[in-house]
Each structure stands twice: as structure tokens, then as C-alpha cells.
């Protein structure tokens, strides 16, 4: 499962459903009239009416009600429950990171890619950059274990954040790139200071891709003239700007071919061990917990 979109707005019609004008309302709000199976006059206590609405991923349910377009039919691509449970996270964080590199940024083999933050989205971006054949892939994080995992997943270099001064990270990236900076910078943390640092460590004509969610009140200050002269591009990207029914099957093929080593970041937990899954995710022991019923 993945996200839903209205299918009628300009973004949807142009093949960008992740930027649907009604994305939040359709995926994260349940106001009755936008719920699946909702009928005028029905109530929560009315039987046998069942209705609901929520994003297809991360619903913590063995059964869930979703819009039809949130479902990706993998019949013929997936064999058995064991394979299906490994692939379960593809429809959100994995496609966000990998899709941002391969689809939104259009990274090429000659590009240098920097990934700020190495959670599920960031590590998926690292794997996506490796699939693209990017010559230099730099992972940036605080956690040493995450940096080691990034190297195992395809990063060519890592920079550890061991200071509150973001300039240290910028200098580290510029040292790896011989002063030039990155062609593609993927910011997955949403930390305003790192966002600003990401822009500085990006090369002229480079792309800065914002994937991490910042506080709603956060503001980014840009030196307008410098930004214009450098020809940099700053773009916000949701869900990798992909069409799930097209991109998820591609990811499945990459997993099977060993190009997207999903097993290195996914961990499985019985549903009754939900709290343990949360603890392991917060501690970094497991990157992508999957609940099993």
C-alpha cells in the first residue's frame, strides 16, 4: 500500500500525485465525507456501516480501509508471506528516499550525492544513488552505526556530525569533493540549520532536495543574489515524486536482483511487541520495523 491522490487536480493529471492539491486531506484527515464507504447520514454507531480514511502505510492494522488507488497490485511479482512482509515498507519511506534520487533529482553516474540524515529515508536515498551508479555518495549522520550501515549500502564516504556547528559538516563534504560541493544534496532531517548547511555544501547548478519535514513555523533565509548566480535549485519532494503503481514494481525487481538490499534495514516484530519495535527504532537498533500479525 502507498498514498492516495485525487487524480483530478493539475499535479495528478501531469503525473505527480504525491503533490496532489488535496494530499493532506485525503491521506491524513478523516472528516466523514472524504472517508471510504461513508454515506450521507451514517454515524459511527450505525451498523453495518464501516468507514474510515488514513494513509495506506503505517496504519498499525491487520486490516485497513483505503482508497483503491493506494493499493499496488503485486500479483505475479511477490511469492508468499515472507517475501511480502519484507517488501511492506516500500510504499512510503523507501520510495521517498530512492525515488527522490532516481526520479525527482534525476541523479546520474557522474553526480556526487550527499545524504543528510541516515534514517529509513536517508539510507534508501543512499541505495537509490548506488542504483543510479553515482560516482560519489556521501552519508552524513551522528550515529556511528548508521554511518557504517551507509557504507555497507553503497556510500563511498561518510561524514560524522560530532559538533553543533553545521559548518564542520559543510567543510567535511567540501573536503571529500575537493572544494566543489555536491551535485545533489538530499536533506532528510528537517533541521533548519542542516537545511541551510545543505544549500551551502551544494555545487553550482546543483539540486537541493528537501525530504525531511521541518516545523511549520521554520523559515529558510537565502542570500538571493548568491543563490541566483550559483544556479542552484531547491525543491520540496514528497514520496519521491513517484507514481507508486509504476515505481513499487521497479523497487521489487531491484530487491530481487540484490540492488536494493532491503533486508539490511528491515526488522520484524509480532504485533504484541509494538513497544519494543518503537524502542528499537528510536535507539537505531532497527531502521525500519515491520509489525506482523
Predicted regions and their residues:
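Glycine-rich phosphate/adenylate-binding loop and adjacent beta-alpha elements
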Residues: 1-71
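A glycine-rich, Thr/Ser-enriched phosphate-binding loop motif common to dinucleotide/cofactor-binding enzymes
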Residues: 44-60, 78-103, 116-124
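Short helix-loop-beta connector
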Residues: 82-83, 106-112, 180
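Glycine-centered, small-residue-biased loops immediately flanking beta-strands
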Residues: 111, 206-207, 232
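Adenosine-nucleotide cofactor-binding segment
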Residues: 112-118, 130-197
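C-terminal hydrophobic helical "lid"/dimerization subdomain
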Residues: 196-200, 241-293
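Helix-to-beta-strand junctions that scaffold the AdoMet/dcAdoMet cofactor pocket
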Residues: 202-204
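Rossmann-fold NAD(P)-binding glycine/threonine-rich loop
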Residues: 213-231, 246-250
Amino acid at each position: 500500500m502507498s498514498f492516495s491522490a485525487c487524480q483530478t487536480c493539475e499535479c495528478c493529471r501531469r503525473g505527480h500525485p504525491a503533490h496532489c492539491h488535496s494530499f493532506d486531506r485525503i491521506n491524513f484527515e478523516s472528516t466523514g465525507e472524504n472517508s471510504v464507504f461513508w454515506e450521507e447520514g451514517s454515524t459511527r454507531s450505525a451498523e453495518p456501516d464501516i468507514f474510515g480514511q488514513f494513509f495506506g502505510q503505517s496504519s498499525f492494522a491487520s486490516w485497513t480501509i483505503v482508497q483503491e488507488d493506494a493499493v499496488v497490485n503485486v500479483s505475479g511479482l511477490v511469492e508468499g508471506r515472507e517475501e511480502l512482509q519484507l517488501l511492506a515498507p516500500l510504499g512510503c519511506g523507501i520510495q521517498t528516499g530512492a525515488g527522490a534520487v532516481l526520479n525527482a533529482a534525476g541523479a546520474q553516474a557522474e553526480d556526487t550525492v550527499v545524504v543528510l540524515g541516515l534514517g529509513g529515508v536517508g539510507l534508501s536515498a543512499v541505495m537509490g544513488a548506488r542504483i543510479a551508479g553515482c560516482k560519489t555518495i556521501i552519508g552524513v549522520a551522528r550515529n556511528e552505526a548508521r554511518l557504517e550501515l551507509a557504507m555497507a549500502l553503497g556510500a563511498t564516504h561518510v561524514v560524522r556530525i560530532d559538533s553543533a556547528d553545521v559548518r564542520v559538516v559543510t567543510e567535511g563534504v567540501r573536503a571529500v569533493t575537493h572544494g566543489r560541493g555536491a551535485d545533489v544534496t538530499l536533506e532528510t532531517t528537517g533541521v533548519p540549520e542542516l537545511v541551510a548547511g545543505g544549500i551551502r555544501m551544494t555545487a553550482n547548478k546543483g539540486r537541493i532536495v528537501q525530504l525531511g519535514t521541518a516545523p511549520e513555523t521554520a523559515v529558510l533565509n537565502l542570500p538571493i543574489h548568491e543563490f541566483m548566480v550559483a544556479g542552484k535549485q531547491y525543491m520540496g519532494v514528497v514520496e519521491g515524486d513517484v507514481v507508486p503503481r509504476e515505481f513499487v514494481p521497479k523497487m521489487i525487481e531491484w530487491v530481487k536482483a540484490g540492488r536494493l538490499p532491503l533486508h539490511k534495514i528491515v526488522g520484524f516484530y509480532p504485533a504484541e511487541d509494538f513497544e519494543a519495535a518503537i524502542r528499537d527504532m528510536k535507539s537505531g537498533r532497527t531502521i525500519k520495523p515491520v509489525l506482523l500479525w
